[in-house]
Design a protein with these regions (language model features):
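Terminal transmembrane helical anchor/hairpin motif
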Residues: 1-12, 131-199, 203-204
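Secretory targeting signals
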Residues: 7, 11-19, 61-62, 66-126, ...
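Long, hydrophobic alpha-helical segments
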Residues: 16-39
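Hydrophobic alpha-helical transmembrane segments
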Residues: 16-17, 46-57, 77-83, 124-139, ...
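Residue-level signal for the membrane-embedded core of alpha-helical transmembrane segments
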Residues: 21-29, 72, 76, 108, ...
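Hydrophobic/aromatic residues in alpha-helical transmembrane segments
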Residues: 29-33, 81, 117, 165, ...
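Helix-loop-helix units of permease transmembrane domains in multi-pass membrane transporters
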Residues: 36-66
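Transmembrane helix-loop junction
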Residues: 39, 83-87, 123, 147, ...
């Protein structure tokens, strides 16, 4: 029971799941990424890692792809929800597949952005708890913060909300893959991975 019960909406809909998922990921992804570099720094193995015949970008991308793959694998079992909702629909198969597919694409981009943020924060401290807390804060701010700011500046609310992840995730969840939304998430991901590389280069020098 409850507002996030996907079987309790009265129609074939996965909105409760896709509404809850960003909240779960805000805590799950930082928990996965917090040790990416903070543990290396704490154990004194980061210097050794940076001397390997790999570019810093390759090292960062390896950590990023590892985290991304792990979280995506955790999301795959939720496809069962799609099958269940589709089969329970009246008539059977009465589900908005466009919206569902768009929402999953939105989740993928959201996971990538959160992962990049989490990996970046893991370079800020050798304490993984600190890395976790900072990552949670940044993910929360980028997803909910701009919506909150927009609510108190109604004259430019649309402009302010466009800086937040929630606005773009909701857009993709409508089943429309707008290049602006894809570019937004890609930019956030690349920017935070670039910050990670910069921090590691500073540490190396």
């Amino acid at each position: 029971e409850g507002e996030y019960n996907i079987l309790n909406t009265g129609f074939s809909d996965l909105t409760p799941f896709f509404t809850l998922a960003p909240w779960i990921l805000i805590f799950l992804i930082p928990a996965v990424t917090m040790r990416s570099f903070s543990d290396e720094k704490k154990q004194g193995t980061l210097e050794l890692l940076l001397t390997k015949p790999l570019s810093i970008w390759q090292i960062v991308n390896g950590k990023f792809l590892g985290a991304l793959l792990l979280i995506v694998m955790a999301i795959i079992p939720t496809f069962i929800y799609v099958a269940v909702i589709s089969n329970l629909g009246i008539p059977e198969g009465n589900i908005d597949m466009g919206s569902t597919i768009g929402s999953y694409f939105g989740l993928l981009f959201l996971i990538a952005a959160y992962s990049a943020i989490g990996i970046f924060t893991s370079t800020l401290s050798d304490n993984q708890i600190v890395a976790f807390i900072v990552a949670v804060f940044l993910c929360f701010f980028f997803y909910f913060g701009f919506e909150g700011i927009a609510s108190v500046v109604p004259n430019i609310a649309t402009l302010v909300a466009a800086f937040g992840m929630q606005d773009h995730f909701k857009s993709m969840s409508r089943g429309v893959l707008d290049t602006r939304d894809i570019l937004y998430f890609t930019s956030i991901t690349v920017v935070f991975l670039s910050f990670t590389v910069y921090n590691l280069k500073s540490f190396k020098s």
